Amino acid sequence: MKTKEIVDDVTMKRAITRITYEIIERNKQLDNVVLAGIKTRGVFLARRIQERLHQLEGLDLPIGELDTKPFRDDMRVEEDTTLMSVDITGKDVILIDDVLYTGRTIRAAIDNLVSLGRPARVSLAVLVDRGHRELPIRADYVGKNIPTSSVEEIVVEVVEVDGRDRVSIIDPT
């Protein structure tokens, strides 16, 4: 098994800053935007984007935490640990996750969102898009496109959970 670091902490910070600038440029009314991080690492990325938006625009956008497990089609979990302190009906919700792969987690996140309200618009921001979609889902904001083979694995580490920021690719062969 071979592990290779492909994104270090500095590059990750730049990618998050780039996503933040794109959010500012593409959303005319930022006061209608709600950030929704997908547990676990997507929540921490959402908080960083929220912090950068505050630094750049002086806005304190609401942020929620989406638990996709109860909405997945490949597992059965009853407990839903979603935290959404704002009504998302009529809001522009930006889903935020660490890796976009098959699209199944995003589908589950959208199912969770519509159970909470009816957003005006839903868009997707991901740190890494690795390809290999099984569903017709694409990211609106991408930090890094990293094409992989289907046997490789992308591992995102964030300092809040893992003690460091980095993205690695693992080749099991």
Swiss-Prot record:
Tagged with keyword ATP-binding: no
Intervals of motif PRPP-binding: 93-105
Taxonomic superkingdom: Bacteria
Signal peptide range: none
EC number from the UniProt entry: 2.4.2.9
Listed GO MF terms: RNA binding; uracil phosphoribosyltransferase activity
Matching Pfam families: Pribosyltran
Keywords annotated in UniProt: Glycosyltransferase, RNA-binding, Transcription, Transcription regulation, Transcription termination, Transferase
Chain residues that bind substrate: T40, R41, D97, D98, V99, L100, Y101, T102, G103, R104, T105, R130
SUPFAM superfamilies: PRTase-like
InterPro entries according to UniProt: PRibTrfase_dom, PRTase-like, PyrR, PyrR_bifunctional
GO biological process: DNA-templated transcription termination
Catalysed transformations (reactions): UMP + diphosphate = 5-phospho-alpha-D-ribose 1-diphosphate + uracil
Record flagged with keyword Glycosyltransferase: yes
Subunit note: Homodimer and homohexamer; in equilibrium.
Stated family: Belongs to the purine/pyrimidine phosphoribosyltransferase family. PyrR subfamily.
Cited function: Regulates transcriptional attenuation of the pyrimidine nucleotide (pyr) operon by binding in a uridine-dependent manner to specific sites on pyr mRNA. This disrupts an antiterminator hairpin in the RNA and favors formation of a downstream transcription terminator, leading to a reduced expression of downstream genes.
Protein name per its UniProtKB record: Bifunctional protein PyrR
